[in-house]
Each structure stands twice: as C-alpha cells, then as structure tokens.
A protein has these predicted regions:
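A short acidic, helix-capping loop that chelates divalent metal ions and anchors anionic groups
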Residues: 41, 78, 135-141
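Glycine-rich beta-strand-to-loop/alpha-helix junction loops that act as flexible
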Residues: 131, 163-168, 184-188
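Conserved N-terminal beta1-alpha1 strand-loop-helix module at the mouth
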Residues: 1-93, 100-127, 146, 153, ...
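A short, polar/charged loop-to-alpha-helix boundary motif
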Residues: 93-94, 137
Length: 201
C-alpha cells in the first residue's frame, strides 16, 4: 500500500497471552471482518523464526481483507514477510535506522510519550505515532500514563497521524474528545472479546 493512504482509525495490536495460535488467528480474522483498519503483530517473547512463522500466517489473513500488517519491533521479520511496515518503541532501534532499513515505501510507526519525542520521530521518518498509555494497560506491567493534554499537544506539533493507546475501550474513549488524534489502538478490547467482530465495529 501507499504509506500516504495509511488509515489508523481502528488499530488492533495483538496479544498472544490471551490465545492459542489458532484462536489468535481467528480473532484477527473476525476483527478484520469487523472493520479494523490496521493490525500490529506483537510477539515480545518469540524468537525470529517463530515470529516470522506467525507473521506469515497473520499476513495471509490481513491480505485477504486488505488490512495492512505492521510488525512490532522487528525490522527483519517485517522485511522477510513483506509486511506493510514496522512499529518501533522507545527501547527499539531508532526510527531513522528503521526508515533506512525499511526503505521509502514501507510504513514506519513510532511510540511517543512527549512532544519532543514525537517531533524527533517525525523528523526521522515516522509515518504515524502511537501515544500512551492513556489508561492503565494489562499488556505492560509498568507503564507511565500519558495525559490527554499531552496527546493533544503532540497532535498539534506534528503533521502525521497520532494514535491513542492504552486501556481504551468503547466505555472510556469519550475522554479523548477534542484531542485531535487520528485513531485509537486497542488490545484487550478486541483480543479478549467474546465477539471480536462486533467490538471492532
């Protein structure tokens, strides 16, 4: 896909801790049917070969629904499975390095908790930003919460899309009203849902 056409409205981040491989793939498919616009495969505890194997399986599903697949952390896995892009966090390789390795046509996303980090990521070639955690999250044991006012400041500081992440669901997303973000990233709201397709809608 053309990275200029990136749609981050509803951004699903996977979490294998809730699933067997079979149920994770089923959940991703149901979420794609429900309307997620981007899927990020996150496998913190898998080695390269296992990660790549799962990436190919997830990409087969996302391709079927024309949903771009983003690989968390691993540029090598993203390139090997020809994913749409990669997402790098603050402790991963620098955005500028990810951009150089991925080339000009792939998507590079970055995590930003401050305006300074957001501006730096943008200048280094990021296509979008993940900002948060807005609320406490079950995916990270220790997390520093990001104020909605900071999210708003980031949205005003850079011209690329910003996605709010962290403990968000249909019941609490009203706090984001007026922040100016382009989309919302969810993990447990879909990955733990009895009906992922319905929750994605």
């Amino acid at each position: 896909m053309d990275r200029k056409d990136l749609d981050v409205t509803l951004y699903l981040v996977t979490d294998s801790s809730y699933h067997t491989e079979e149920s994770l793939l089923r959940t991703v498919e149901e979420a794609c049917k429900g309307g997620v616009t981007l899927v990020q495969l996150r496998e913190k505890n898998k080695g390269g070969r296992e990660y790549l194997d799962k990436a190919f399986k997830v990409k087969e599903i996302t391709d079927r629904y024309n949903v771009p697949l983003i690989i968390d952390d691993r540029v090598d896995v993203a390139l090997a499975c020809d994913a749409a892009g990669v997402h790098v966090g603050a402790s991963d390789i620098p955005v500028a390095v990810a951009r150089k390795l991925m080339g000009p046509d792939k998507i590079v996303g970055a995590t930003a908790k401050t305006v300074e980090a957001a501006v730096k990521a943008y200048e280094d070639g990021a296509d979008y930003l993940g900002v948060g955690a807005i609320y406490p999250t079950t995916t990270k044991v220790v997390t520093i919460l990001t104020k909605v006012s900071t999210l708003k400041d980031i949205c005003e500081a850079v011209p690329i899309p910003a996605v709010a992440i962290g403990g968000l669901n249909a019941g609490n997303m009203d706090v984001l009203e007026g922040a100016g973000m382009s989309g919302m990233a969810v993990v447990s709201a879909i990955m733990k849902a009895e009906d992922p397709k319905k929750n994605a809608r």
